A protein has these predicted regions:
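Generic N-terminal amphipathic, Lys/Arg-enriched alpha-helix
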Residues: 12-21
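Glycine-rich phosphate/pyrophosphate-binding loop regions near the starts of catalytic domains
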Residues: 19, 27-160
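Short linear motifs in intrinsically disordered/low-complexity regions
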Residues: 11-12, 142
């Protein structure tokens, strides 16, 4: 076996690091998941659509389940914002598997110094997108991290 687990083979230096391309979807992200994530979390045989399929959502006992994290800069952009993106992406990935989205969980990681006005704009956008999709946020979580560590906020949206 390899001395160092690698995305590209057995000879990756130990100081290799994650880059932005690893989070951009496609073949590079698939290799990251296959080499690093699946050895720890794969193997659940009770799923109709499980992690190994590398789909955007899972199906367990007929229930479609999705989780998606969003970290974009700027958080407001032409045509939308991080909140609308989080709802739309989650609802879309559930619908693509033929299910009707029922409920969402929304987690926030807020950077110290984020303007409350920006937070309210994101929350209002999430609410509007939920109303358009016919779903509700029914649970969630909020954490705050030190200034300079995020670039604003990260939104995780999960749904069934």
């Amino acid at each position: 076996g390899c001395a160092v687990l690698s995305l590209w083979g057995c000879n990756m230096p130990e100081n290799e690091r994650v880059t932005m391309i690893h989070g951009a979807g496609g073949a590079v992200m698939a290799k990251l998941i296959e080499k690093f994530v699946l050895p720890y979390f794969g193997g659940f045989e009770g799923a109709e659509v499980g992690l190994e399929v590398l789909d955007d959502a899972a199906v367990v006992d007929g229930v479609v389940f999705k989780s998606d994290s969003h970290a974009v800069r700027p958080i407001f952009f032409p045509g939308g914002d991080i909140g609308r993106l989080a709802v739309a992406g989650t609802v879309n990935d559930i619908a693509v598997l033929g299910a009707e989205p029922l409920a969402l969980a929304c987690g926030f990681v807020l950077e110290e110094g984020l303007a409350f006005g920006d937070l309210e704009r994101v929350l209002a956008s999430i609410k509007a997108a939920c109303e358009e999709a016919g779903v509700f946020v029914v649970t969630g979580d909020t954490k705050v991290v030190e200034k300079g560590s995020l670039g604003g906020l990260v939104v995780n949206m999960s749904g069934i």
